[in-house]
A protein has these predicted regions:
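A short pre-motif secondary-structure segment
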Residues: 567-570, 612
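Conserved long alpha-helical elements within nucleotide-processing catalytic cores of c-di-GMP signaling
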Residues: 504-526, 533-560, 569-573, 577-578, ...
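Bacterial carbohydrate/catabolite-sensing allosteric modules
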Residues: 1-54, 59-336, 345, 525
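A short, aliphatic-rich beta-strand micro-motif
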Residues: 424-427, 435-445
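Catalytic-core segments of nucleotide cyclases and related cyclic-nucleotide turnover enzymes
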Residues: 544, 590-597, 608-609, 621-655
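Amphipathic HAMP/coiled-coil signal-transducing linker helices
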Residues: 337-341, 486-505, 511
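Amphipathic alpha-helical "output/dimerization" segments
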Residues: 462-482
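Helix-loop-beta substructure at the N-terminus of cytosolic sensory domains
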Residues: 344-384
Length: 655
C-alpha cells in the first residue's frame, strides 16, 4: 500500500518573473515555503501588464486560466505586479475566478485585493530614510517627490511618507511639493520637461517613487545640459538593475519585498495549519539604501561587484563542472544561436528534439516539461480563452548529468500516450519527491493563440528562478513552434488539392517515398486508380458547379474507404489514387473495390432530386514492397486495370 502523502502546495500568481520586484517576491515565498516543506507553483506571464501589444498580452494572461485551485492549499496574489496605471481588469478577472472556483485561503501582496488580507512592504520607512539621507548627508533643503498616479494607494502612501519626514526635518512638507507621474520612464521625462521649461523651479533634490521615473528624469535632464548631481540630486526606489546599470547610477532603496513575501506565506500557513509553529522571516543584508552617483555619493562597492559579476559581463560567468550556466547569462544565450538553430527546422518531431538539445541553457533545473494542445500544429484552430479538456506533455527533460529512472524517463515525442486531463495541470505534480520543489508555469503561445504551456521545475535553493534567460529562451521556443506550424501549413497547401482536401500528385510522391523507407521488406503495397465517369458530360449539360459536386462526392467516398495511414490522392481533374501498405493481398484490394461500389451507390441514393448518378471506374494492383519499380509504372498498371473495369461496366450498361 502506498503511504505517500502529497505535500501541501501554494500557488503564486505574478507577472514578469524576471523583473526585480517579482524576483524578490518569488525568492521570499520560495524560501519560506521550504521551511514548511511546501511545494510552490508559480503561475506567471513573461511580460509586464504594461506590455504595449494587448493582443499578445491576452495570450500571456491565459496562463491564469490553467489554475485548478482544488489542487493547491493556498493562493498568493502579487497584486501590485498585476495592475497597470490603476487598471485592474486582470485583478477583477482573477477575483471572479477565485470567488467561483477557490475555497482555499488567499493573501494579496502589496495592494488591496477584494476583501482578502493584504501584506505590505514598508514603503513609508523606506521613503523616510531616503529623505533623511538627502537632508542630513547632502544638506538639501528644497525637495520634490515625483510619485505615481494620483489616488493610487501606492503613490499616495509614498507621498505621505515624504511629507511626514519633510515636516519632521523642519522643512516644507506641504502637498505643493508632491507631483504625480506614471511609474514609468515617461513620467520622469515629462517632469524633467516641466523643470526645463521653467514651469517648476529647480529643487535641490527630487525623490522619485520608483527607479524608472528616476532614470527618465535624470537622463532627460543630462541630455539638456543639467548636471546630475551637481545641480540637482535624484533618487529612486526599488533597487532595480536598470538603476544600477544607468550611465549615472541611481541612488535607490531596496525595500524588504523579500520579507513581505515571506510574511505572506506565514499568514497563509496560519490558515492552512492553525496551531502549528510559525517560521521566522529572515532579514536579507542587501535590504536598505543603495547609494549611487545620482545623489552625490560614490556607488557602493557591493553594487560594483554585482555589476562586474552579472550576466551582462561576458568575461565573468559562473558555470557547472559540465560547462553549463549556473546563473543568468544573457551573453551565453546569444552565443548559443538558439533562435537561428530552431528557426530553420520544419519538422514537428525535429523541433521537439532540438528544443531538448538546448535545455542546457536552463541549468540548473530539475525538470523541464513542454505541454501542448493535441492540435497545436493546426493554425486553423485557435485557442483564445482557457485550455482544451485534455493536453499532451510532449517533452520531459532531465539534466544530462542525472540518470533516468524506471518511472521517469526523458522523452520528446508528440504522442497520444502522453495525453492527460488539463485539470491535473501537470501529472508530475503528484510524483513522490524527497524535497519540496518549485514549478514555474509559463505560457506557450503566438500572439493571442495559446499553443500550450511550459513548466520549469527547480530546487528550492536553486540560484535560477524564471529569469531573463529562461523567459527569453521560452519566447524563442514559442516562436519556433509557430514557425513550424506555418511551414507545415505552407507545405500542406503545396501538397494538397484545395477542392477535396486529398493529396495532390506532389504530395503523393513525397508521401510514397517516405512510406517506402518505413515499410518492412515482406510488406505489400496496394494501389487503386479511380476515374470518375462522364465528368465532361456533367459539366456540359448541368454546369461546372454540378461537376464539382460530383468530384467532391467521389472524394468523400474515397476518404471513407481509406484507412488512417493510406495515401489518398486527387491526381488530376477526374482521376484519383489510393495507396495502402502493410500485410495486404489482392483479395483485400477486391474487397475495397466492392466497398467503394456500395458506398457510391448509397451516396447516389441519398442525394435529393439528383440530376445524374455519380459513377467511377476503379482498378487495383498489389505488389511486394521489395520491388524497386517506379511508382508511375505501378500506377500505369492499376490504370490499365481501371480501364478494363470501365470497358466492362460500359458494356454491361449497354447490354
Amino acid at each position: 500500500m502506498n503511504s505517500h502523502v502529497p505535500r501541501k502546495r501554494l500557488a503564486l500568481l505574478i507577472s514578469d518573473p524576471s523583473a526585480d520586484y517579482s524576483q524578490s517576491v518569488i525568492t521570499g515565498v520560495r524560501d519560506q515555503c521550504a521551511k514548511y516543506d511546501y511545494d510552490l507553483l508559480v503561475f506567471s506571464t513573461m511580460v509586464k501588464m504594461c506590455h504595449p501589444d494587448k493582443v499578445y498580452l491576452s495570450g500571456e494572461l491565459n496562463i491564469f486560466n490553467l489554475i485548478n485551485y482544488d489542487l493547491v492549499d493556498g493562493v498568493l496574489v502579487a497584486s501590485l505586479a498585476l495592475v497597470e496605471d490603476q487598471v485592474k481588469e486582470v485583478l477583477e478577472k482573477l477575483e471572479a475566478d477565485l470567488r467561483l472556483y477557490c475555497t482555499k485561503p488567499v493573501v494579496s501582496l502589496d495592494l488591496p485585493f477584494a476583501d482578502y488580507p493584504t501584506v505590505y512592504t514598508d514603503d513609508k520607512k523606506a521613503i523616510r530614510q531616503v529623505v533623511k539621507h538627502l537632508v542630513n548627508d547632502h544638506h538639501c533643503q528644497k525637495l520634490y517627490i515625483l510619485t505615481g498616479q494620483k489616488d493610487y494607494v501606492v503613490s499616495e502612501a509614498r507621498a505621505e511618507a515624504f511629507c511626514e519626514q519633510m515636516k519632521a526635518e523642519g522643512l516644507d512638507g506641504s502637498k505643493d511639493n508632491v507631483f504625480y507621474g506614471n511609474f514609468w520612464y515617461t513620467g520622469g521625462e515629462e517632469f524633467a520637461n516641466r523643470l526645463l521649461s521653467g514651469e517648476l523651479s529647480m529643487p535641490d533634490a527630487v525623490v522619485c517613487a520608483n527607479d524608472y521615473m528616476a532614470i527618465g528624469l535624470a537622463n532627460r535632464l543630462i541630455t539638456e545640459g543639467v548636471k546630475v548631481p551637481e545641480q540637482v540630486r535624484i533618487t529612486g526606489y526599488d533597487a532595480t538593475k536598470d538603476a544600477l546599470y544607468n550611465t549615472v547610477s541611481i541612488t535607490t532603496y531596496n525595500p524588504d519585498v523579500y520579507g513581505m513575501a515571506a510574511s505572506a506565506v506565514n499568514l497563509l500557513h496560519k490558515q492552512i495549519e492553525p496551531g502549528t509553529a510559525v517560521a521566522d522571516v529572515e532579514m536579507l543584508q542587501h535590504y536598505g539604501l543603495r547609494t549611487g552617483v545620482s545623489c552625490g555619493c560614490v556607488q557602493s562597492a557591493d553594487d560594483l561587484r554585482s555589476l562586474q559579476g552579472s550576466g551582462m559581463n561576458p568575461n565573468e560567468r559562473s558555470r557547472n563542472p559540465d560547462g553549463s550556466l549556473t546563473v543568468n547569462d544573457m551573453q551565453g544565450l546569444h552565443e548559443s544561436y538558439m533562435f537561428e538553430t530552431l528557426s530553420v527546422i520544419q519538422d514537428k518531431k525535429q523541433i521537439l528534439d532540438t528544443i531538448t538539445d538546448v535545455t542546457y541553457l536552463l541549468q540548473p533545473y530539475r525538470r523541464f516539461y513542454l505541454v501542448l494542445r493535441s492540435d497545436w500544429s493546426d493554425t486553423s484552430i485557435r485557442c483564445l480563452n482557457g485550455y482544451p479538456e485534455t493536453m499532451r506533455c510532449v517533452m520531459r527533460c532531465i539534466p544530462q548529468n542525472e540518470s533516468e529512472s524506471e518511472t521517469e524517463r526523458r522523452y520528446a515525442v508528440d504522442s497520444e500516450g502522453h495525453t492527460f486531463r488539463t485539470k491535473l495541470m501537470l501529472p508530475a505534480l503528484d510524483e513522490e519527491r524527497d524535497e519540496p520543489v518549485v514549478f514555474y508555469f509559463l505560457p506557450s503561445h503566438f500572439s493571442d493563440d495559446t499553443i500550450g504551456f511550459a513548466v520549469l521545475q527547480t530546487a528550492m535553493d536553486a540560484k535560477r528562478t524564471a529569469d531573463e534567460v529562461s523567459t527569453l529562451w521560452l519566447r524563442n521556443v514559442n516562436n519556433s513552434l509557430h514557425m513550424v506550424r506555418v511551414v507545415s501549413k505552407l507545405i500542406d497547401y503545396s501538397v494538397r488539392d484545395s477542392m477535396t482536401g486529398l493529396l495532390n500528385r506532389r504530395g503523393m510522391e513525397m508521401m510514397f517515398d517516405r512510406r517506402r523507407e518505413q515499410v518492412a521488406p515482406d510488406d505489400s503495397f496496394l494501389i487503386w486508380v479511380i476515374d470518375m465517369d462522364g465528368l465532361k458530360h456533367i459539366n456540359d449539360n448541368f454546369g461546372h458547379e454540378q461537376g464539382d459536386v460530383g468530384i467532391i462526392t467521389l472524394a468523400e467516398a474515397i476518404k471513407s474507404i481509406s484507412d488512417k495511414e493510406d495515401i489518398a490522392v486527387r491526381t488530376g481533374g477526374d482521376e484519383f489514387v489510393i495507396i495502402a501498405s502493410g500485410r495486404l493481398t489482392e483479395q483485400e484490394g477486391r474487397e475495397r473495390i466492392s466497398r467503394f461500389e456500395r458506398l457510391l451507390a448509397d451516396k447516389n441514393a441519398a442525394r435529393a432530386s439528383r440530376l445524374f448518378d455519380i459513377s467511377a471506374s476503379i482498378g487495383c494492383v498489389c505488389f511486394s514492397a521489395s520491388e524497386q519499380d517506379a511508382l508511375d509504372e505501378k500506377i500505369r498498371e492499376a490504370d490499365h486495370r481501371m480501364y478494363e473495369y470501365k470497358v466492362a461496366h460500359k458494356k454491361q450498361r449497354n447490354d
